[in-house]
């Protein structure tokens, strides 16, 4: 999966095109940036990239944010910024942290950044913002490779050498951000994707992989609807990998799939890969209680369910609808009536004390 966007500043006559994707086999996201001179004369360009490095649990976005930033240990390398907090913050018992967060960069020909702004403070300054940082307004030079900073909010900002861009010419930049427990991987990955040629090859590999996961196309006469239907078929793949609410500022859940998602994934797979759907339907029915309610936390294994969030049993008006409509479509598509004779145990992890209290 990938996305591309372009932005042109007509008054300045410069265009930036950005392509973002995840290279296969590397726990990172790669961003290719192409800056094009749209004018009819030479232009001096000095590019500074800036991506914040949050570097800890989503829980700390609002809770103990400052305290957890004090745990950051930040250093700059030849190609980027690396942050490894000393502890994983947990009031029940703090643990030694092994996760490393990084942001690396290079020019399309492999040229390394000239200097770095490894902390939010050094980049935005006292009066600036992320959109108007003091480091750019004041033409700050940053720090070189090999510097270290402790106890600050980390920032993957790096300044590249100033270049003269001829009329109509372009220059490429490659940015790589990720996380790993391997202390060598960040710098190794930076060398793997430090040129446009390497990044383009990784993109083609990733594109072929994702295109192969959706093995169906639509021709309704409406190209927009065709693309939308293909996107719908692709969503269950993303949900299996990332969950539903995987962003730290999302306000619902912790990223796992929910009851509706199980059945909606089955509906999609009826089109993409029908042979898997029978077992998925049977496994999903294992989350139904004998009173018609259902478990609300989905386990890691097929057919595994956990009792309700916060130990509160709830009833949603549409939850019973999804097993019905999914099974009905499966029967109509396959004619597999034998599935109705299969035995599946009810979900039992519940206390009915609250029900007896009203008797």
Where are these regions (language model features)?
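Polysaccharide-binding surfaces and accessory modules of carbohydrate-active proteins
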Residues: 22-25, 29-139, 189-215
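Alpha-helical support elements that line or immediately flank enzyme active sites
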Residues: 261-287, 330
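Conserved small/polar residues in nucleotide/adenosyl-binding loops
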Residues: 353-359
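Aromatic/His-enriched, Gly/Pro-containing loop or helix-boundary segments
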Residues: 20, 291-320, 326
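Short Pro-Gly-centered flexible turn/kink motifs
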Residues: 43, 163-181
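Extended, loop-rich substrate-binding clefts of extracytoplasmic carbohydrate-active enzymes
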Residues: 1-28, 132-158, 230
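Low-complexity, Ser/Thr/Pro/Gly-enriched N-terminal "stalk/linker" regions
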Residues: 203-253, 279, 283
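Hydrophobic or amphipathic alpha-helical targeting/insertion segments
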Residues: 34-35, 46, 54, 320-322, ...
């Amino acid at each position: 999966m990938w996305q591309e966007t372009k932005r042109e500043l007509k008054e300045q006559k410069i265009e930036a095109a950005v392509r973002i994707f995840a290279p296969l086999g590397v726990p990172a996201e790669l961003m290719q940036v192409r800056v094009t001179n749209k004018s009819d004369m030479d232009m001096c360009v000095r590019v500074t990239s800036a991506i914040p490095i949050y570097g800890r649990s989503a829980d700390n976005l609002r809770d103990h944010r400052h305290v957890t930033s004090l745990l950051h240990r930040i250093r700059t390398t030849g190609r980027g910024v690396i942050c490894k907090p000393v502890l994983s913050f947990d009031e029940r018992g703090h643990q030694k942290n092994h996760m490393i967060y990084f942001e690396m960069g290079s020019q399309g020909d492999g040229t390394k950044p000239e200097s770095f702004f490894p902390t939010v403070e050094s980049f935005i300054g006292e009066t600036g913002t992320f959109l108007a940082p003091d480091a750019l307004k004041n033409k700050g030079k940053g720090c070189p490779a090999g510097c270290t900073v402790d106890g600050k909010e980390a920032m993957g900002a790096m300044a590249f050498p100033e270049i003269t861009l001829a009329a109509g010419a372009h220059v490429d930049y490659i940015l790589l951000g990720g996380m790993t427990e391997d202390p060598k991987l960040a710098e190794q990955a930076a060398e793997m994707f430090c040129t446009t040629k390497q990044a383009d090859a990784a993109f083609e590999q990733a594109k072929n992989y994702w295109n192969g996961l959706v093995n169906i196309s639509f021709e309704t006469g409406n190209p927009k609807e065709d693309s939308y239907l293909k996107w719908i078929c692709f969503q269950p793949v993303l949900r299996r990998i990332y969950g539903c609410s995987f962003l730290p500022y999302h306000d619902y859940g912790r990223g796992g799939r929910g009851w509706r998602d199980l059945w909606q994934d089955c509906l999609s797979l009826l089109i993409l890969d029908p042979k898997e759907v029978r077992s998925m339907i049977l496994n999903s029915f294992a989350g139904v209680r004998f009173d018609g309610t259902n478990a609300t936390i989905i386990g890691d294994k097929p057919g595994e369910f956990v009792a309700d969030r916060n130990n509160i049993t709830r009833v949603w008006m549409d939850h019973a609808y999804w097993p019905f409509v999914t099974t009905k479509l499966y029967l109509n598509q396959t004619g597999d009536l034998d599935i109705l004779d299969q035995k599946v145990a009810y979900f039992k992890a519940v206390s009915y004390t609250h029900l007896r209290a009203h008797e």
